[in-house]
Amino acid sequence: VTLNLDAPFLQRRDANFRPLTPLNFLFRSADVFPDRDAIVYGDRRVTWRDYARRCLKLASALRRAGIEKGDVVALLAPNIPAVLEAHFGVPLAGGIINTINIRLDAAAVAFILEHGEAKVLLVDPQWSAIAREALALLPSKPLVIDIEDDMAEDGERIGDLTYEELLATGSEDDDVVWPQDEFETISLNYTSGTTGNPKGALYHHRGAYLNALGQVLHHKMDADSVYLWTLPMFHCNGWCFTWAVAAVGATHVCLRKMVAEQVFDLIEATGVTHFCGAPTVLGMLVDGAERSGKRLGAPVAVMTAGSAPPAPVLKAAEDLGFIVRHVYGTTEMHGVVSLCDWHREWDGLPGAERSRMMARQGVRTVVTDEMMVADPVTLAPVPRTGEAMGEVMFRGNMGMKGYLKNPSATEAAFAGGWYRTGDLAVVHSNGYIDIKDRSKDIIISGGENISSIEVEEVLYQHPAVASAAVIAMKHDHWGERPCAFVELKVEGSLAAEELLDFCRSRLAKFKVPDRVVFGPIERTATGKVQKFKLRDLIQDQGH
């Protein structure tokens, strides 16, 4: 006899099914840890009880201001308490939160505001000039709210009212808008623009919920954890830590700007246990420690991603007392989807080997359903040889809904039933992936593939090099040749030929760059090198 599991009394009901959403995390922490610090910002401290109350008032105020389900509320602000409040208050009003990259120019901000059809814009005074210029480019202006902040640099008021005035119009007793379907949109995140105009990735409540839990599990956080905001909240909603910290009732420490000495001071003053950031952040901390002589009083866990971390930087960070966890992800997958899950037996490896192992992007997270490295045409997985290269692909609950107003790009991203990252990797015998390049960044010279990351790793090994980026430049005979852009720790401390000699002793001859360009390397706010700008620069110079 077959069991009848489709009987009416066995179907979903309120008692046994609710759409997954990270919004519930806030209220649990307010119930369990009402008087513990939820947010620390300078001399200001906000308890979990008051944090929840302010989020409820924000949701109410937005509804009373005309925000309806599915409306976009944008923010142009650094890592401050108002942004944390908006991550709950906006979706509790039924809205979609859109945190805008604060390093963008006015034209790019205007593009995002118009493309996302933002109904409200919250602005930090330090960015009021950019916001004013962006708003002037729009056919219609959203409701503008000034976030007043004593710690901000001077900036004029451009809004219709202040953030506190907005909150005063709301009530914590008003009803909130819960998602009826966990696939409803919770946020709108624009890609970092390494290839031109950004695309708007739509996140859903289910993905945000699962990724938040995956983060606290893999980052080993609990109610006693103190999380420092060195990672921009506008990047993948701070890799979902805007919600994840609430899941365990930990403490947020807000930071307007990444300054190495200030980070060390905050770690000591507030007992920071965790933070995230691109490898450039690790590099800044290593350099800052060298200048100031600062050290950690206790270990601090760091989750790093954004680009392959150079082995020398990883080793130097560990020597300072940081516990580095290398992760990997994309805007389109709610942030982090894989990590170099560490094996305790690797602790005994020689330093250089440990760093090489840690630089791998590793294996899928506990909430990532499937990951593979495969031929982009046939979808055949590459062998685990550590040599055969393929494209990194994912599928499962972490995938975005799609790109806003861009069906063709959405279909291309999900072609073949997988999300195509465009990253090229090998798979080692233990199943750990190792990204070698972006598909568009691989250098093909005389029919041979040259990994720009491999060349960059060697450049980073030189003690005078602070940062490096390698691109392909056109060559009449070989088709393409490597060109290295290099930032030095001390300007003028190294000659190009000296650096090339260093490379020749560590690389195959055909992989050694033909040219070295010294100077600043332009990056996105999340630490990714904008290689398309470097290519344009070389092309403009006739190379």
Regions from the PLM with identified roles:
Residues 209-226, 234-273, 288-289:
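Conserved AMP-binding/adenylation subdomain of ANL enzymes
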Residues 17-18, 23-27, 35-80, 84-88, ...:
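Conserved AMP-binding/adenylate-forming core of the ANL superfamily
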Residues 364-393, 429-430, 492-496, 530:
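Conserved beta-loop-beta connector loops within the AMP-binding
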Residues 64-65, 92-168, 490-492, 517:
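Structural core segment of the AMP-binding/adenylate-forming
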Residues 34, 145-146, 159-161, 168-190, ...:
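Conserved pre-ATP/AMP-binding loop-to-beta segment of ANL
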Residues 47-50, 186-210:
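Conserved AMP-binding A3 loop
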Residues 104, 121-123, 275, 396, ...:
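AMP-binding/adenylate-forming catalytic core of the ANL superfamily
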Residues 247, 269-277, 286-356, 369-370, ...:
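Gly/Ser/Thr-rich phosphate-binding loop
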